[in-house]
Regions:
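N-terminal entry segment of metal-dependent catalytic domains or homologous docking segments
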Residues: 1-61, 127, 159-161, 231-232, ...
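PP2C/PPM family metal-dependent serine/threonine protein phosphatase catalytic domain
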Residues: 5-20, 88-100, 131-172, 207-228
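Acidic loop->beta-strand submotif enriched in PP2C/PPM serine/threonine phosphatases
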Residues: 19-29, 102-116, 120, 144-189
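Hydrophobic residues embedded in beta-strands of well-ordered beta-sheets
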Residues: 33-35, 119-120, 129, 137-138, ...
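Short hydrophobic beta-strand that contains or immediately precedes a catalytic carboxylate
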Residues: 36-40, 122-124, 178-180
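Helix-loop-helix
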Residues: 58-96, 198-219
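Catalytic core of PPM/PP2C metal-dependent serine/threonine phosphatase domains
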Residues: 71-130, 164-171
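C-terminal catalytic subdomain
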Residues: 163-333
């Protein structure tokens, strides 16, 4: 089973000009196929946010229906032609509905799909596609620039078909994919070294042990408070990660495994600390404030806060609206 987490936030420049967020992400899991897609609407195209939304949804539906056909077809150009043609047909109909030109719906497109140990990657335009293989973070596809400086290729561009990248193969140790827009590149992609920031690996690792809604909230907070401050552009990210069946949930971990997860070692009081952390983690299954936690574990608030801060540093606990709650998955169904 593959899971997805996604985030798209309006850039500072678009907030100032009252322009909608033009980055769109989408995830679909059907027919034993999991697909993620990201599209960055062209800043020069007035309706690009509508186009970005359409192409992400349409490509995900297309790949859940045609994955095997596309994977087994040896003529890559023929597949690309069908995909681009299908997307342009959808954009043409949308342009009629919105009473605009197809070029007004221009966007890039990044896609990763998996099914039964196989993958397909598609890329038109800028943005970056990364993946994790055997625990190592790698790049599958770098940004594709246009003919002129500071330009890129869009699904609606005349050279979309000729520049479109398509990769497919066996997963063989690949456990996650990440798609990022060019706005997010400023913080999470090193152009000189052509490498992704270690934060991606951390997000993917956390997605295997953290509750999906908690990870989603933390990603959104990070994007709002950190990522988007590095650029005026919209910022988006979507990841697809294989579930870690070796993690049964925190409550089923052995004491040694819990110590390892919490980095507890070399302390004479480690057993006592672990027991206290267990108590806090269980108690915060439902949100509580500091006073409630302090009262429950019979510890003064300033010392209680230190324990909670430590658990937050390990991403086991998160804080929202003055209350704390457990972020780590306690039990798996």
């Amino acid at each position: 089973m593959w899971n997805s987490v996604q985030c798209a936030v309006q850039g500072r420049g678009h907030i100032k000009s009252n322009t909608p967020c033009q980055d769109k992400t989408y995830y679909l899991n059907e027919n034993d196929t999991s697909v993620i897609a990201l599209a960055d609407g062209a800043g020069s195209a007035s309706m690009s946010h509508f186009g970005a939304e359409l192409v992400t949804q349409k490509i995900c539906r297309l790949l859940t229906q045609q994955f095997d056909i596309y994977f087994n077809e040896e003529d890559g150009v023929a597949i690309k032609r069908v995909i681009v043609g299908t997307l342009l047909e959808g954009l043409g109909k949308l342009a009629q509905d919105l009473d605009c030109e197809v070029k007004d719906l221009a966007s890039t497109l990044l896609v990763a799909a998996v099914k039964n140990g196989k993958y397909i990657i598609l890329h038109i335009g800028d943005g970056v596609i990364g993946y994790v293989k055997n625990g190592e973070l790698k790049i599958a596809s770098h940004p594709e620039n246009g003919e002129f400086v500071n330009t890129t290729v869009f699904v609606t561009s005349k050279d979309a078909l000729s520049t479109m990248k398509m990769m497919k193969g066996q997963l063989n140790g690949i456990t996650g994919f990440a798609l990022i827009s060019d706005g997010t590149e400023a913080s999470l992609y090193n152009k000189r070294e052509k490498s992704l920031a270690p934060a991606f690996k951390k997000i993917m690792d956390l997605s295997k042990i953290m509750k999906a809604d908690c990870l989603q909230n933390e990603m959104e907070r990070s994007f709002e408070n950190v990522i988007k401050n590095s650029t005026t552009d919209d910022c988006s990210l979507i990841i697809l990660v294989e579930e870690d069946y070796s993690f049964p949930g925190y409550r089923k971990l052995s004491e040694a495994q819990k110590r390892d997860f919490l980095s507890l070692s070399g302390s004479l009081c480690v057993g006592k600390r672990l027991k206290r952390y267990d108590d806090i983690i269980d108690y915060l299954e439902n949100p509580k404030d500091l006073f409630q936690v302090s009262k429950h574990i019979h510890l003064r608030k300033k010392y209680c806060r230190k324990h909670i801060d430590y658990l937050m540093s390990k991403n086991f606990v998160i804080a929202q609206k003055g209350k704390y709650s457990t972020a780590i998955i306690l039990d798996k169904d």
